[in-house]
From Swiss-Prot:
Enzyme Commission number: 7.1.3.1
Subunit comment: Homodimer.
The keyword Transmembrane is assigned to this record: yes
Binding sites annotated in the UniProt record for Ca(2+): D650, D682, D686
Protein name stated in the entry: K(+)-insensitive pyrophosphate-energized proton pump
GO molecular function: diphosphate hydrolysis-driven proton transmembrane transporter activity; inorganic diphosphate phosphatase activity; magnesium ion binding
Binding site for Mg(2+) 2: N220, D223, D441
Endpoints of the signal sequence: none
Name of encoding gene: hppA
Annotated transmembrane regions: 6-26, 54-76, 81-103, 112-132, 133-153, 168-188, 240-260, 265-285, 300-320, 335-355, 385-405, 413-433, 472-492, 524-544, 593-613, 620-640, 695-715
Subcellular location: Cell inner membrane
Length: 718
């Protein structure tokens, strides 16, 4: 036990180091030069808009959070309610601080890029690393400190239901914040982007980030609340939920075993070791002699991955060791096999990154095919973009299937859980790559609006093009890890259900349940699969509709300002930027509520609906379990298709900004008919990749974690 406490303290220390590194990086970024007075004025407008939106968003979520907190206290326990509060607050804090730094780093990055490309890269990446290491550090601290309080201070057994319910509630708190942040931020950012592009680029013929466009500031605000705060909340949730689900599986599989404490600590130690490797990896991000920005970022990612292999070995040595640790479902589990499962998780991460970059990177076949299709018109651009989005699901799915089967063969479902934990262990570096994107995008916008030298805009455009790819790559990683993480949650659901059924005397609600079968000959299972499968499509449709409405409102507002203030186009009148920001803030908050509640309420509706119709608890639990699988499978494909397809559409549009040479050798420049067709495709792809697709991620996980909590509530009530 003393060794276990020492390991837990070491894990907590790793989380503290991550947060301290982020604080050091914040001080370093804020000490950088902010540039000219005009640059600072533009940055201040972006900062005010982002802060106003996020404050209003979190105020709205807080109302829902208070209701859920009281419900968790009443239906479960005070420890579960506190767990929910910890998950929700830390998720919100991560996004808020990350965005707070991002909206201050943008102007500093623009100024640094005016001096050198290497300087701009260093500052933008350091800003991204702050968000990344806050995500990893605070998620690790949230789970490990609360686990320490429950098991060491309060003396609960690691497998006690109080501990498990409290940790699952912590994951639910993170999930609830995540789905609101992802969806609300996505509606804001893409409403601004779509509305601004349609009127500014297509109708008025002015370039991106032109200060004459009334939606320009709103667009830059959206980059931060969507790609920075939204992604931070998303991966914070995935990180926390995956670690919790792995610990829950460990508690179920090894209950009563001498090694139970070590098994519960193993995923925490993996994350603790990997957060340190992520910190070290940030120092490898340096621009090389070839000037490749993507190469510089990949150096950091590869270094983190290789060092994490050593981290996995350390985690094994300090917790489960290398020999046999037990038998689960007739399969012998060894420490060596668990290490190999962690290694497979890192390999899956690498493959997903490479595949996503292929489908979204400039000068790659998929993006070039969309650019080529733009030459023949708007319709062919959309058709080819949809084709690429559908095709982009195949290879990631094969990689994920390979990861599931290989880890299951090595160590059963617990091995799969360890693989996902290893994937999430390097989330600090992955989020750093993602948060790099909005900083460079904003830096380019500030350079354009402040009228800086074209060479500065050239440097920020180079950073932004890479940032666009890193955002797509990290979305692919987030979706892959979310799909595997949801599978671990489903395993926790099915095993938790079996545990309650086997202990009917302690949990009377489950005593007369009868056997639960997930056999496909069971009509309730098929019905559950179909119902679960519709959720990602319905959710995605609601998200796209919300962006369409928000974007339409922006179009009307921008047209109104151009009509009523003709001096805007000549530079004699200043656009009312604040009006578009306020309009989008109200629209995003209003539009995010109903879609966000869909995946939260769906599991409850499935269970009680089938119970009411069939009168059988076993049928209701079978239908609920099947619906979770339906959400996982369809959600995985919908999310990958939308994010990769949208990223490809975006970079196809960017291909025309320096001139795209088609198959016949004709060069098409910005403003050409082919470029206008590519803007249309990007208008479709924007809400695909930045609103609906990413928001499906937390929707997949929240349905599973609500199902787990439903089991806990029914057990507690009995």
């Amino acid at each position: 036990m003393q060794m276990g406490v020492a390991v837990l303290v070491l894990v907590i220390a790793c989380g503290v180091v991550s947060v301290l590194f982020a604080i050091w990086a914040i001080r370093s970024v804020l000490a950088a030069d902010q540039g000219t007075q005009r640059m600072q004025e533009i940055a201040e407008a972006i900062r005010e808009g982002a802060s106003a939106y996020l404050t209003r968003q979190y105020s709205t979520i807080a109302i829902v959070g208070v209701v859920v907190f009281l419900a968790a206290w009443y239906l479960l326990s005070i420890s579960a309610a506190i767990g929910f509060l910890i998950g929700a607050v830390l998720s919100g804090v991560t996004g808020f601080i990350g965005m707070h730094v991002s909206v201050r780093a943008n102007v500093r990055t623009a100024q640094a890029a005016s001096l050198s490309l290497a300087g701009g890269l260093e500052l933008a990446f350091k800003s991204g690393a702050i968000t990344g290491l806050l995500v990893a550090g605070l998620a690790l601290l949230g789970v490990s400190v609360y686990y320490f309080i429950l098991t060491v201070w309060l003396g609960y057994s690691p497998s006690d239901r109080t501990v498990i319910d409290a940790l699952v509630s912590l994951g639910f708190g993170a999930s609830l914040i995540s789905i609101f942040a992802r969806l609300g931020g996505g509606i804001f950012t893409k409403g601004a982007d779509v509305g601004g592009d349609l009127v500014g680029k297509v109708e008025a013929g002015i370039p991106e980030d032109d200060p004459r466009n009334p939606a320009t500031i709103a667009d830059n605000v959206g980059d931060n609340v969507g790609d920075c705060a939204g992604m931070a909340a998303d991966l914070f949730e995935t990180y926390a939920v995956t670690v919790v689900a792995t610990m829950v599986l460990g508690a179920i599989f090894f209950n009563g075993s001498d090694i139970l404490s070590s098994v519960m600590l193993y995923p925490l130690m993996i994350c603790g070791a990997c957060v340190i490797t992520s910190i070290v990896g940030t120092f490898f991000v340096k621009l090389g002699v070839n000037g490749s920005i993507m190469g510089a970022l990949y150096k950091g990612l590869i270094a983190t991955g290789l060092l994490s292999i050593v981290g996995l070995a350390i985690a094994n040595t300090l917790t489960v060791g290398w020999g046999e640790i037990g038998t689960v479902a007739g399969k012998s589990i060894t420490g060596t096999n668990l290490f190999l499962c962690g290694l497979i998780g890192l390999i899956v991460t690498g493959l997903i990154v490479v595949i996503t970059e292929y489908y979204t990177g400039t000068n790659k076949r998929p993006v070039n095919s969309i650019a080529q299709a733009s030459v023949t018109g708007h319709g062919t651009n959309v058709i080819q973009g949809l084709a690429v989005s559908l095709e982009s699901t195949a290879l990631p799915a094969i990689v994920i299937v390979g990861g599931i089967i290989s880890t299951y063969q090595l160590a059963g479902l617990f091995g799969t859980a360890i693989a996902v934990t290893a994937m999430l262990g390097i989330a600090g570096m992955i989020v750093a790559l993602d948060a790099f994107g909005p900083v460079t995008d904003n830096a380019g916008g500030i350079a354009e609006m402040a009228g800086l030298d074209p060479e500065v805009r050239k440097a920020t455009d180079a950073l932004d093009a890479v940032g666009n790819t890193t955002k797509a790559v990290t979305k692919g990683y987030a979706i892959g890890s979310a799909g595997l993480g949801a599978l671990v949650l489903f395993a926790a659901y099915s095993n938790d259900l079996a545990y309650f059924a086997a202990n009917g005397q302690t949990y009377p609600y489950f005593a007369d349940m009868g056997p639960v079968s997930f056999d496909l000959s069971n009509p309730y299972v098929v019905a559950g699969l179909i119902f679960g499968g519709l959720i990602p499509y319905l959710f995605g449709g609601m998200a796209m509709t919300a962006v369409g409405r928000a974007g339409g409102a922006v179009v009307q507002e921008v047209r109104r300002q151009f009509r009523e203030k003709p001096g805007i186009m000549t530079g004699k009148e200043r656009p009312d930027y604040a009006r578009a920001v306020d309009l989008l803030t109200r629209a995003a908050i209003r539009e995010m509520i109903i879609p966000s509640l869909l995946p939260v309420l769906a599991p409850i509706v499935v269970y009680f609906g089938v119970l009411l119709i069939s009168g059988s608890k076993a049928a209701a639990f079978a239908a609920l379990g099947a619906s979770l699988l339906g959400v996982i499978v369809n959600g995985l494909f919908v999310a990958i298709s939308m994010t990769s397809g949208g990223g490809a559409w975006d970079n196809a549009k960017k291909s025309f900004e320096d001139g795209f040479t088609d198959a016949d050798g004709v060069k098409h420049l910005k403003g050409s008919e082919a470029h206008k067709a590519s803007v249309t495709g990007d208008t479709v792809g924007d809400p695909y990749k930045d609103t609906a697709g990413p928001a499906v991620n937390p929707a997949i996980k929240i349905t599973n974690i609500v199902a787990l909590l439903l089991l806990a509530v029914l057990a507690h009530m009995s």
